[in-house]
Amino acid sequence: MGCAGTRIIDLRPDDEKAINEVAALLVEGFKEHSPDSWPDIESALEEVQESLGADRISRVAVDQKGTVLGWIGGLPHYAGHVWELHPLVVRPEHQRKGIGRALVADLEEHVRERGGLTLWVGTDDEDGSTTLSGVDLYPDPLEHLARIRNLRGHPYEFYQEMGFVIAGVMPDANGWGKPDIHMAKRV
């Protein structure tokens, strides 16, 4: 990782400081592109608490002082064969320094250890960041998907660089013209 001394550890249920930092990071990290995801600290804290379940993976990147720089979660589907990456967030001032990549790689390793075969992520476009947003994807969503272009730094290209492929799209997942782009990779 680009930040010296950064390490990735489990987010523990007894680490109230880290839990609160992660919740604040969720609100801050998603407010520009997906403001309804976690609009307030209460909804973010609920999401973080859910991530601490025994069947879940919840990992944080922390600096030398223990400050949370990023968070990633994973939850099992299909009897544990498929895991969902949900969510991934990195402090804005620490983005593009390898923390997100390290968190994804770490999650992949934990998914493999638990017998997972596939990791998938839904990466919403609620703000016109791709050519899939603001249009009617019916009657042929796959035709639109085949011509997808990134207009404003949508993270689907980050995931492609991490080995994910676009596996589908859910039209109108977040309201009319606001799709969820489904991406997956074998681990």
Question: Can you say where each PLM-predicted feature lies in the sequence?
Answer:
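Conserved GNAT acetyl-CoA-binding A-motif
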Residues: 112-151
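Short secondary-structure capping/turn micro-motifs that flank functional sites
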Residues: 42-43, 127-128, 174-176
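Acetyl-CoA-dependent GNAT
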Residues: 9-86, 91, 101-106, 110-114, ...
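C-terminal "cap" of GNAT-fold acetyltransferases
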Residues: 2-7, 15, 140-187
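Conserved G/P- and acidic residue-centered "switch" motifs that form tight phosphate/ATP-binding loops
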Residues: 98
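A short, internal acetyl-CoA/4′-phosphopantetheine-binding micro-motif in the GNAT/acyltransferase core
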Residues: 88-95, 123-127
